[in-house]
Amino acid sequence: MIDISRELQVVANTGRLTMGVRQSIKAILNGDAKLVIMAANVPPSIRQDVERYAKLSQVPVFTYAGTSWELGGALRRSHKIAVVAIIDPGESSIMSLAGGANV
C-alpha cells in the first residue's frame, strides 16, 4: 500500500499536476490528465461532473480518504483542494493507483 500523501508531494516536486475543479476538468478534456484524485467531501454535483468527463476521456478517478483540507495539506498548501489532476507523475509511483480502487 502506498502512502498517497507522500506520493502527492513527490508529484508536486518532480512531476506536474493541476489543482482545482476547473483546471482539472480542463486537463481531462485536453487529454493531459493521467489520474484524477478527489477529496472525500467533494459536493455531489462536482463529483458527477468530474466523473463524467473522466469516464469520457478514460481517465481513472480515485477518492482521497480525507477532506479537501487534508488533500490541500498533503500538497503542502494552506487551503482546500477538492480535485487534483496528475499530468506527469514524475518520480512518484502514484500511477500504481490507476489499477486499484478508492484511495
UniProtKB/Swiss-Prot annotation:
GO terms for biological process: translation. InterPro entries: Ribosomal_eL30, Ribosomal_eL30-like, Ribosomal_eL30-like_sf, Ribosomal_eL8/eL30/eS12/Gad45. GO terms for molecular function: RNA binding; structural constituent of ribosome. Transmembrane segments: none annotated. SUPFAM superfamilies: L30e-like (SSF55315). Keywords: Ribonucleoprotein, Ribosomal protein. GO terms for cellular component: cytosolic large ribosomal subunit. Belongs to the eukaryotic ribosomal protein eL30 family. HAMAP family: Ribosomal_eL30. This is Large ribosomal subunit protein eL30. It comes from Caldivirga maquilingensis (strain ATCC 700844 / DSM 13496 / JCM 10307 / IC-167).
